[in-house]
Amino acid sequence: MRILIADDEAIIRLGLKATLEAMGHEVVGVAADGLSAVELARTAHPDLVILDIKMPGIDGLEAAEAISRERPVPIVILTAYSSRDLVERAAGLPVHAYLVKPIRPVELGPALEIAISRFREEQALRQEAADLQEALRSRDIVQQAKRRLMEVHGLGEEEALRWLRARARRERRSMREVSEDVLKGLPPFDNTPSA
């Protein structure tokens, strides 16, 4: 896996890099501050990002938010602080795992796996929500076209729906595409649509 590391302590960066490489990962970027981490994420295209919370400039949580806004990836937060307010702040952001320093290699592997798993679940939910939104938009368009056929051609509701279905089958197009044509007045319909 291609991983980006950001920590303001050089010793932590070196140790983390060595541990990750020993685990078989490729470290594609190392940053000492949050802004550099955001820039590196832009150019290195990591599969996962590990960020320290306390860094100069923008902190790890701000960097996590900026990185996720541009190109969502799994994010693991490292910190020497386990204060409740930091944990709560991290929980409200696109953070997929949270580790308290000093990091032991035995903890790092599972944290990466959990982060990847949570990220995938999050992405699947986003896709499902987008698919549902698209289905609702399609349904609304079909409903509008059905009403148009009922008003313009005097069809009953079932008759208008049958007409849309038959046209979609005949033209090998989706009901939404046929409905969009009806709403645009394309193609010109004769005065007696028939199933």
Predicted regions and their residues:
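Conserved acidic segment of CheY-like receiver
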Residues: 1-12, 16-20
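Active-site residues of response regulator receiver
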Residues: 52, 79
